Structures are given as C-alpha cells and as structure tokens.
Amino acid sequence: MTRTDGDQWDIVSSVGFTALMVSSFRALETTRTEPLIRDEYARAFVEASGEPRLTEALAAGTPESEWDTATVYLVNHLAVRTKYFDEFFAAATGSGIQQVVILAAGLDSRVYRLPWPDGTVVYELDQPKVLEFKDHVLREEHAVPLAERREVAVDLRDDWIAALRTAGFDATKPTAWLAEGLLAYLPGAAQDALFENITAHSAPGSFLATEWRRRQATAGQWQDAVNKLKPEFIKDISIGSLIYDDERQDPIEWLREHGWQVDTANRLEQAAAYGRPAPSEHSDVTSLWSDAYFITATR
C-alpha cells in the first residue's frame, strides 16, 4: 500500500482501507455495555465491503472481556477521538453555525447520528469511490440524514475549494471545519495548503478541529508502534507506508499566527478523562502519544 503522487483508492485499498478499519473499531465500541459513542452504521459499512479480515472479526462477536490488549487500545483510541469531535460539533452548532465541512469524511456517519439544528448543511469531502461506496450502503440501510448532506467527490491534494463552492459552500457564513485523522496522510505542502484554504474561506465565528503530534514520528516509528498494537486480524496491514513524514509546519503555531484562537487537549489526558486510559502494557507506544493533541480553534 505504498503512496504515490496522485494516487487514488476505493474503500478496500490504500488510505480507503484505513477508513474501513476505523469503522470496524467504531462498530466494536458500539457493542460495549457503556460505549463512549454509538455508530449504528459502522458495522454495515464493514459488512458491505466484503473485506474478509474485518468482516470475520466483527462476525466472531468476541465479547469485550475477551478482547486482546491491542484491540482494547485501538477501540479506545477511536472512541475517544470520535467523542471529542462529536463534542466539537455540539459546541460549534451551539454557537449558531449551520455550515459544516468534514474533510476526508471517509465513513463518518455524524450527519446521520448527531442532532443537528434545523437548517444545517453538512459537506462531506472524499475520494469519489469512497463516497460512492458510502452512499450505496446508506441507501441500503435506509439511513435518513438529520441535516442536509452534500457529497463533494474530490482529492484534497487538488482544488477542493472550487469543488466545495460548486456544491453550494458559502464563505461568507461561519463554518465548522473538521480534519479528523487526516494530516498524516497529506504531504507537508498539501497540509499547509489545506490550512491556508480553510483560513481564507472562514468567516468570523468559524470553528476548526483537527489533531496533531508536536513531535512527529517517522513512518518507521509509526509502523513499529502499529505493529505492537495491531490485533491479529490486521497484522499484515502496513499503515506506516501510507503516511507522510516530511517536514511541515506545526498547525497549532500556524493557526495562532494566522488569527485563530487555539485550544488544545492532550490526547492521553483526554482519554483518561473519558475513562479510557491507555493500557500500561504498551508504555513505549503510549509515549508516542504523550505530545499528541486535539486542536480546536475559532476566529
């Protein structure tokens, strides 16, 4: 799954497969007695993909008490991230925002599972084949969006702002932007361009959320960490080959320098606050997250 310039993917290949893995862990979280989040569509996405490793893992129905440490770690990791950004949207829409942009939306189902104020429009941007798969599954599930959903099939390394405008985006209105689980999959120049475009098209009152590790890990470090954390059913997947570890600006500093009011939440501290602390068995891996932050910003 090595990256190349201009590479494309569907839901079972390259970066698309990571969205499917995220869905599998959200599906597992949803089966818990006291889940942090509930995503009733996550299982449907995995099952519809036909991807044997993930579908078999869900079909096994292994009770939470028998999950291995790696599964617990990853399910917790995704549940904490999902809940944090769910709360971000609650705060943004609570301020009166009715325009939402989810970048690299993947199999995000927030438009179907979160309460949205009347009149909210949610734009979902991702690769064409990913959105095609997602739309098919949601139709099969007879899913009803709780806000107006507009899909924008575009590569975020291309002129995605033009595609967003064509879909009806209004830069004069405040916007809630989400870049969840995205930055590591962009080259440094594309990340910089992403924040430049967001800033240039954010009216006063806009919100932004993303995540960042202030001490960037190399692709090799990531692969070592992931290898220790991967459950048996995805041991052969090379996540490290999908990320970019080239030089880039720290978005926390960049956003502050460009007029955003920035707040951060340490990822490990947030996990503990939600009652999902990192397992002590992987202290060396956990250290990679010790300077990882959720970022929320307003302007």
Curated annotation (Swiss-Prot):
<keyword id="KW-0808">Transferase</keyword>
<comment type="similarity">
    <text>Belongs to the UPF0677 family.</text>
</comment>
<dbReference type="InterPro" id="IPR007213">
    <property type="entry name" value="Ppm1/Ppm2/Tcmp"/>
</dbReference>
<comment type="function">
    <text>Exhibits S-adenosyl-L-methionine-dependent methyltransferase activity.</text>
</comment>
<dbReference type="Pfam" id="PF04072">
    <property type="entry name" value="LCM"/>
</dbReference>
<protein>
    <recommendedName>
        <fullName>Putative S-adenosyl-L-methionine-dependent methyltransferase MAB_0027c</fullName>
        <ecNumber>2.1.1.-</ecNumber>
    </recommendedName>
</protein>
<dbReference type="InterPro" id="IPR029063">
    <property type="entry name" value="SAM-dependent_MTases_sf"/>
</dbReference>
<dbReference type="GO" id="GO:0032259">
    <property type="term" value="P:methylation"/>
</dbReference>
<feature type="binding site">
    <location>
        <begin position="155"/>
        <end position="156"/>
    </location>
    <ligand>
        <name>S-adenosyl-L-methionine</name>
    </ligand>
</feature>
<keyword id="KW-0489">Methyltransferase</keyword>
<dbReference type="InterPro" id="IPR011610">
    <property type="entry name" value="SAM_mthyl_Trfase_ML2640-like"/>
</dbReference>
<keyword id="KW-0949">S-adenosyl-L-methionine</keyword>
<feature type="binding site">
    <location>
        <position position="126"/>
    </location>
    <ligand>
        <name>S-adenosyl-L-methionine</name>
    </ligand>
</feature>
<dbReference type="GO" id="GO:0008168">
    <property type="term" value="F:methyltransferase activity"/>
</dbReference>
